[in-house]
Amino acid sequence: GDYVIFHELTHLLDTANLGAGDQKKNAMVRGFLEYHASQIETIKILGYESIGENISFSMKQQVETVASIKSMQNFVDEPANTAKSLLRRSDFPKDLETLLTTAALIFNYYGRRSICLMHAQDYREDVDIIEFSEFIGTAQLAALDTFL
């Protein structure tokens, strides 16, 4: 899907604009980059070209991902569910890569979720975010909601 290309291009653009440097050294910048790229990919997977369009959709709407066709609800919840399974591993965090991947998945979920909060007719919060708050911090996650 071309939504993946738009996700990665957003990372490139944001990195250039923010002068982010080494992403592994700045977790919040890395988090924002993932959050924003996930917003763009969500708009794109829904078939919209721009945030300026009149975006409206149902969480039951089917979207085609690289792996399969799934509902928007499943598309949005997928990174959260993967992050939760990583957080619940007895050896978490096994290594730096696992730690960074888990954080990226959480920010990815928040980016997708933000588009749903703003534009879905029937969005419901299915994911319990308590584990995310404990991992990333309540204040940081609350700050993401200010971007809505």
Language model regions located:
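Catalytic micro-motifs at enzyme active sites that drive phosphoryl/nucleotidyl and oxygen chemistry
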Residues: G1, D22-N26
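Short catalytic/ligand-binding loop motif for oxyanion handling, primarily in non-cytosolic enzymes
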Residues: L13, G21-Q23, F32
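Post-HExxH zinc-binding segment in Zn-dependent metallohydrolases
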Residues: K25-E64
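Hydrophobic, Leu/Ile/Phe/Ala-enriched alpha-helical segments that form helix-helix packing faces
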Residues: L9, L13, E41, I45, ...
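Short alpha-helix boundary/capping elements
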Residues: L13-D14, I45, E49, G111-S114
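Pan-zinc metallopeptidase signature
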Residues: S71-L148
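Active-site recognition of the HExxH zinc-binding catalytic motif
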Residues: D2-G19
